[in-house]
From Swiss-Prot:
Its main location: membrane. The chain crosses the membrane at residues 8-28, 86-106, 187-207, 210-230. It holds the Pfam family Ctr. Residues 154-169 have a biased composition (Polar residues). The lineage of its organism: Eukaryota, Fungi, Dikarya, Ascomycota, Pezizomycotina. Keywords: Copper, Copper transport, Ion transport, Membrane, Transmembrane, Transmembrane helix, Transport. Residues 153-175 are annotated as: Disordered. This is Copper transport protein B. It comes from the Eukaryota. PANTHER family: COPPER TRANSPORT PROTEIN, SOLUTE CARRIER FAMILY 31 COPPER TRANSPORTERS. It is a multi-pass membrane protein. GO terms for cellular component: membrane.
């Protein structure tokens, strides 16, 4: 129909003396069906988009629900990661048990750090005691060698300098060993400190879910961890990020 109207209009324009006016009328006439078709197509397109949006809205269910206020609701609760998604009572119960164990494990890491610090201090104390003992005995050993009337003077002069009492190596070796032990201990303590910082911030993220069940699980884990790993340590430690 649109093509037929266009042909009729062209023929009329060629035969009409009022070419300008007739051409305008033909353009308007032939454009009406095309515009209508465009409107129909646009309406269909928008309708399709609305349908797509409708389907998208239907697929929005099951995503993580991030709470910024205290709540007891566990619907679509995600803990730290989107993969850690609470989907029902069983997953909630298992997650709370895991949180209790994780929080108790933090106290275990702190206990391991305290024990290593004590052992490191004991090792360094042994080095200090040994070095002091050698330093006290060195003058007496030197005087004993010099006052020995049976010592062969020629043998004494032929002893290598590295083996003479005045230039013996126990003190130097002790200092070198102490330095190595200190450096190794410092690296291990730094690693343990980094683990504690990471662990404590992870627990902070657990608490920042603002979910009452998760908060209670963190508190129960801290309670259990102190009972198991406390070792009569002071319970007055202030809670901080690390």
């Amino acid at each position: 129909m649109h093509q037929l109207s266009t042909s009729i209009c062209l023929c009329f324009v060629i035969s009409s003396p009022y070419v300008y006016l007739v051409s305008i009328a033909c353009v308007l006439w032939t454009s009406i069906p095309f515009t209508s078709g465009m409107m129909d197509h646009s309406a269909m397109h928008h309708s399709g988009m609305d349908m797509d949006h409708g389907h998208g809205d239907m697929d929005m269910g099951g995503q993580c629900n991030m709470n910024m206020l205290f709540t007891w609701s566990t619907k679509d609760l995600c803990i730290v990661f989107s993969q850690w998604h609470i989907t029902g009572p069983f997953s909630l119960l298992m997650s709370l048990i895991v949180i209790v164990l994780l929080t108790a494990g933090y106290e275990g890491v702190r206990q391991a750090t305290r024990k290593y610090e004590a052992a490191q201090a004991q090792r360094l104390n042994v080095f200090s005691t040994t070095t002091a003992t050698i330093a006290r005995l060195k003058p007496s050993l030197t005087n004993g060698v010099q006052g020995n009337e049976f010592a062969d003077e020629s043998a004494t002069t032929n002893v290598p300098s590295s083996q003479t009492p005045n230039e013996s190596s126990p003190l130097v070796a002790g200092r070198d060993n102490r330095r190595a032990v200190e450096q190794r201990g410092k690296i291990i303590l730094a690693a343990l400190y980094a683990v504690q910082v990471f662990y404590s911030f992870f627990i902070m993220l657990l608490f920042m879910t603002y979910n009452g069940f998760v908060m209670l699980a963190v508190a129960v884990g801290a309670f259990a961890g102190y009972l198991v790993f406390g070792d009569n340590q002071s319970a007055a430690k202030t809670v901080a990020c690390h």
